[in-house]
From Swiss-Prot:
The GAF domain, residue ranges: 52-189
A molecular-function term among this protein's GO annotations: sequence-specific DNA binding
Species for this entry: Citrobacter freundii
The protein's name: Glycerol metabolism operon regulatory protein
Gene encoding the protein: dhaR
Alphabetic keyword roster: Activator, ATP-binding, DNA-binding, Glycerol metabolism, Nucleotide-binding, Transcription, Transcription regulation
Example of a GO biological process term: regulation of DNA-templated transcription
Length: 641
């Protein structure tokens, strides 16, 4: 071992000295064994894995060889395991190396060829030169090898570039040459890697932009369209491929608000506008993002589809839960309401619900909505008392966007695809009555300060506590709107006319309070009887309020007669009480006649509804009416000329 070490030249690097030290332990200097060689599919697989290195390095080596003027040397490309991937240079030199076993696919490992720059450059990862007797193996003493490693963009060893020649042809600049080539290859690999990564990110971005529900457009300061995703092309009726490169003003008639924002490089955020494209009007909610640069401003425009924005808004604010299944069926009046309510749910025609305050008109409206095909759509409730004059008309009818503020969606548009519940329709201002009539008859709306018609698909359910026919005669309500609403009218009788349903309503309310208070509630029979006997001038609303109050004030959830407020025991003048409905002195004939008259009042003299309410056939009802000299037409509401 000492002898071998002493044979090294005096001025060698520590890398070579350490290599000699390793080699002297397991190999002989005098013997030579050709390196192992990868062939066939194995070598092809290695080359495929190193395609990037080969593509760049082969071009670099060929360029370098052209400037060597036929110098007798060879240039090699090796991978990180010192496997020769490619050779070029002087044919005679290449052939001489091949005789030693340095061919494509040969592994130049230190364990086979000993101390040599081909293997050493890949081990410490630094440029290395071995020449003459610096090689451990005597077979390589006639040769000079210079090798420089190539690193990828992560700093990992990716391969090496080597120059080989006989000692008599070596130059002092050989190592510098391999270093220059290796750096060129490394820089090219880095550039290609960054470009590939940039393209990958760009493809991901394009994929993201194409998969968005929003339309996306981008153009430069000259207005030249640079990007248009498929969604934007669909919304604006444009050809995505043919439109790119054209001026956006040649493709679209931009709204004034957007043109001014572009002129002043001012952003817009969720502004509703209307484009004109291919002779069609297109509604969209837009967001404009200016990109201010030294070379000029560019712009990115997002188009949010109006329908999706409306669906998102209404899904958050327009859901109701009351259904017909929650309504008591103990009373024939309530069964009648359920029957006609389900009929009303089948069509898209407007509905008018009539009745006193607090009889549950909105609950019936909710049940109709949830029974209809529009159940998944919005349910927008509007108290028309808030719109008794046109001051708040902008909220009801919406407004077009201006330079100073965004447009506003109307209540009618918010209800699009669902139900619009108009409470106390008699208070609606005349101007708004006309707008509502336009929606009912034509299915379109004109916003305030706008001229364009907006399609609106809503089912209108209105309520009233007065006789609208009288208001029409007094010119206080639109005659045409009354006719439109009167096409399907449901009269909800007061609670005192639905006494059989009172116990069920009470127990339903108590069950609701049980869940809220997380405690048991029960009511004595005499207390229940007194509640049934009360005339309930405030109807269902009053009933719910009183039940909650007495439940709170009861002892341990036990409602006794003593818990009821005093006024429930006193008869109020002018109100029907339970005892006055059916006096004990009446005969059966008088009771029957009174029941028919009451049914005629409730149904406005509609015989079909009277027969259903009384649970008798129409023929029998006609006979009884003739017997008691009852004329149903006397109870009909006065018809308008």
């Amino acid at each position: 071992m000492t002898t071998h070490t002493q044979d090294i030249g005096k001025e060698v690097s520590s890398v070579i000295a350490q290599s000699w030290h390793r080699c002297s332990k397991f190999m002989q200097r005098e013997t030579w064994q050709a390196p192992h060689q990868a062939q066939g599919l194995t070598f092809e697989s290695i080359c495929r894995r190193k395609t990037a290195l080969l593509t760049i390095a082969q071009a670099a080596l060929e360029d370098a060889w052209e400037f060597m003027d036929g110098r007798p040397c060879a240039l090699l490309i090796l991978d990180e395991s010192a496997c020769i991937l490619s050779r070029c240079g002087d044919p005679q030199t290449v052939e001489q190396l091949a005789e030693l076993g340095f061919r494509d696919g040969s592994y130049c490992a230190e364990s086979i060829i000993g101390s040599c720059a081909l293997s050493l450059a890949t081990m410490p990862g630094q440029p290395t030169k071995t020449s003459g007797d610096q090689h451990f193996k005597q077979a390589l003493h006639p040769w000079s090898f210079c090798s420089t490693p190539v690193f990828d963009n992560h700093g990992r060893l990716f391969g090496s570039i080597s120059l080989c020649c006989l000692v008599e042809h070596e130059c002092v600049s050989d190592l510098s040459l391999t270093l220059a080539i290796a750096r060129e290859v490394g820089n090219s690999l880095l550039t290609d890697s960054l470009l590939a990564e940039s393209n990958r990110h760009l493809n991901q971005m394009y994929g993201l932009l194409e998969s968005m529900d929003d339309g996306v457009m981008a153009w430069n300061e000259q207005g030249v369209l640079q990007f248009l995703n498929a969604r934007a092309a669909l919304l604006l009726h444009l050809d995505a491929q043919a439109s790119q490169g054209k001026n956006i003003n040649d493709l679209l008639n931009l709204p004034m608000l957007l043109r001014r924002a572009i002129k002043h490089a001012r952003g817009l955020n969720h502004v509703e506008v209307t484009f004109e494209s291919q002779h069609q009007f297109v509604d969209a909610v837009i967001t404009l993002k200016p990109i201010v640069e030294e070379q000029g401003n560019s712009f990115i425009l997002l188009l949010h589809p109006v329908e999706q924005m409306r669906q998102l808004m209404t899904s958050q604010l327009g859901k109701v839960s009351h259904t017909f299944e929650q309504m008591s069926t103990d009373d024939p009046e309530t069964r009648r309401l359920i029957h006609f309510g389900r009929q009303a749910a089948r069509g898209s025609f407007p509905i008018l619900l009539c009745g006193e305050e607090g009889v549950g008109k909105e609950l019936l409206s909710q049940a109709i909505h949830n029974e209809s095909e529009r159940a998944s759509g919005p349910y927008i409730a509007v108290n028309c008392q808030l719109y008794a004059n046109s001051v708040l008309g902008q909220d009801f009818m919406g407004s077009a966007p201006t330079d100073d503020e965004n447009g506003r969606l109307s209540r009618l548009e918010l209800a699009n695809g669902g139900t619009l519940f108009l409470e106390k329709i008699e208070y609606l201002a005349p101007e708004l009555q006309s707008a509502l009539l336009q929606v009912i008859k034509q299915g379109v709306l004109t916003r305030l300060d706008a001229r364009r018609l907006i399609p609106v698909d809503v089912k209108v359910i209105a309520t009233t506590t007065v006789d609208l026919a009288n208001l029409v005669e007094q010119n206080r309500f639109s005659r045409q709107l009354y006719y439109a609403l009167h096409s399907f009218e449901i009269v909800i009788p007061p609670l005192r006319a639905r006494r059989n349903s009172i116990p069920s309503l009470i127990y339903t309310r108590l069950n609701s309070l049980k869940k809220r208070f997380s405690s048991s509630l029960k009511i004595d029979d005499d207390a229940l009887a007194q509640l049934v006997a009360y005339s309930w001038p405030g109807n269902d609303f009053e009933l719910n309020s009183i039940i909650e109050n007495i439940a709170i004030s009861s002892d341990n959830g036990h409602i006794r007669l003593s818990n009821l407020p005093d006024y429930l025991f006193a008869e109020r003048p002018g109100l029907e009480t339970a005892s006055s409905l059916l006096p004990a002195s009446l005969t059966f004939t008088a009771i029957e006649k009174e029941a028919i008259i009451h049914a005629a009042r409730v149904t406005s003299g509609r015989v079909q509804e009277m027969s259903q309410l009384l649970n008798i056939g129409r023929t029998t009802l006609w006979r009884k009416m003739k017997q008691y000299d009852i004329d149903a037409s006397q109870f009909k509401r006065k018809h308008l000329e």
